[in-house]
Amino acid sequence: LKAAFFDTPGAARDVLRVGHMPVEPPGPGMVQVRIAVSGVNPSDVKTRGGLGARANPWPRTIPHQDGAGVIEQVGAGVDAGRVGQRVWLYECQLGRPHGTAAQWVTVPEGLAVPLPDGVSMETGASLGVPALTAWYCTAQVEAKPGRCVLVHGAVGAVGFYAAQMARLRGAEVLASVSNEGQARIAQAAGIETVPRGADLPAAARQWLTQRQREGFDAFIDLDFAGNLPVNLLLAENGAQIAAYASDTDLHPTLPVRDLMRRNVRLAFLLVYTMPPILKRQAIAQLTHWLKDGSLHHAQVHPYALHDIALAHEAVETRRHVGKVAVIPDGAPLG
């Protein structure tokens, strides 16, 4: 098979290569999937750069956790009826050296989730890490009717889904954007927006006042350290913060007394160690939303396999609003 890989961590252009590797046959409980689209996540880029949250001990790694494709072979114990099934994939490179940046990947069958009719391969490859993280965040902050939720990063991969999911759970949601272009994208998905930066507190206060509320019950945050001051300023007593990243500072000093005064509860989340029972619940709910068309999905920006270094750089520099993906050579259509 043709695949992209790296042998040592480093800059994308320095370490990513494309070449041929043996195809792994599916063993018991495994499926072999022909990859149509390979999704690129910030965590994939961090792993390749040696900055991942988990160790990557393999001598040669095919990157990327997420993707979508068609099951071509199954191992012993797997229903033969799954051959030909369209699936979306998640955590393919978790605890394994081979991810989805290849023409084929072989994974435990539970990581290949049926992709509902009418849902594109591009969308399927966009789920995985972002959608499961978003569901986890909305569950942790108990998004439901009567609660107001502020989502930081309305058009980020996680934030775009999190804002929608919180609304689908019945919460009232406000989400931050960096510019008018981002606001238009978010608003087209039914998300109310507020500008990031110095104007955010006043604009958010006005939004709360219109709802006769004094503060937010919950925050879903892509930068815990950077956004903590504004979150504290806008927090209702007993508010919850679900943080899935803190790139500006992984070792922040916490204003413990201020957090105590407002009885703020903190939840730090990593989808890769999310309890299996919650992951199953997330997949079931996500499948329901996919089938009934409740979710809007980010625009996909595709790169050819031989341009994978450019794809990784696009994620690192936030070149696009939407999802970066890699298309393996000879990828199946549909």
Please name every model-derived segment.
Residues 125-198:
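Mid-domain Rossmann-like dinucleotide-binding core that forms the NAD(H)/NADP(H) cofactor-binding site
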